[in-house]
A protein has these predicted regions:
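Charged, amphipathic alpha-helical linker segments immediately N-terminal to NTP-binding catalytic cores
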Residues: 1-11
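Generic beta-strand or strand-like secondary-structure segments
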Residues: 7, 48-56, 97, 115
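Walker A (P-loop) phosphate-binding motif
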Residues: 17-84
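Phosphate/Mg2+-binding loops and adjacent switch elements
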Residues: 70-73, 77-192
Length: 192
């Protein structure tokens, strides 16, 4: 019953991606941006991957910073810097976890472009990682990493509202890396 709406949603998503990339595609930041996201709704393991990358990049001499939407936090205004001694109710639990565990600067804000600009203006970062920003096309990016839950994969393969996908499976062919989190189901090889 929702299948016809899925076609509308998928078409609007493609049009939105095309428009935002055309409008904002030429902009760059003073540091490269690595976006870690997914094409399905729900938990896929993005934050643990981001945290592992932050730690490895620091060992290799990089000075990473992180931007996040701050889902679950009360803050709804312009971007703010996460205080590692602050409360998850303000920033969201994942940004606070990243700030505490990785000891790196984290900025939360719904507008990721503004969050990146604030991060780079206030900290000596030479690399930015965006937690769950794959569909935030107004934010220029250098590298895209899509995380897929190996046990759930893509559900029924349909986009919202008929299925769990934010974008079609074909979107994975445009990202730089696909990371599979957890054991892969038997149907994965033919899909991937």
């Amino acid at each position: 019953m929702l299948r016809p709406l899925e076609f509308v949603y998928r078409g609007l998503s493609k049009l939105r991606r095309w428009f935002l990339r055309r409008r904002f595609g030429g902009r760059q930041y003073a540091a490269p941006v690595i976006v870690i996201g997914n094409i399905a709704v729900g938990v896929s393991g993005k934050t643990p991957l981001l945290m592992a990358l932050v730690m490895q990049l620091r060992l290799r001499g990089f000075k990473p910073g992180v931007v996040s939407h701050g889902y679950g936090g009360e803050h709804r205004g312009p971007p703010i810097i996460v205080d590692s001694e602050g409360a998850a109710s303000i920033y969201g639990d994942k940004p606070l976890l990243i700030a505490r565990q990785c000891a790196c600067p984290v900025v939360v804000g719904a507008n990721r472009d503004h969050a990146v600009r604030m991060l780079l203006a206030n900290f000596d970062c030479n690399l930015v990682l965006s937690d769950d920003g794959l569909q935030h096309y107004a934010m220029p990016r250098t590298v895209e990493v899509a995380v897929v839950d190996g046990s759930r994969l893509f559900g029924n393969g349909y986009c919202l509202p008929a299925g769990p996908l934010r974008e079609s499976i074909a979107r994975l062919s445009t990202v730089d890396f696909v990371a599979i989190n957890g054991p892969i189901t038997d149907s994965a090889p033919e899909i991937l």
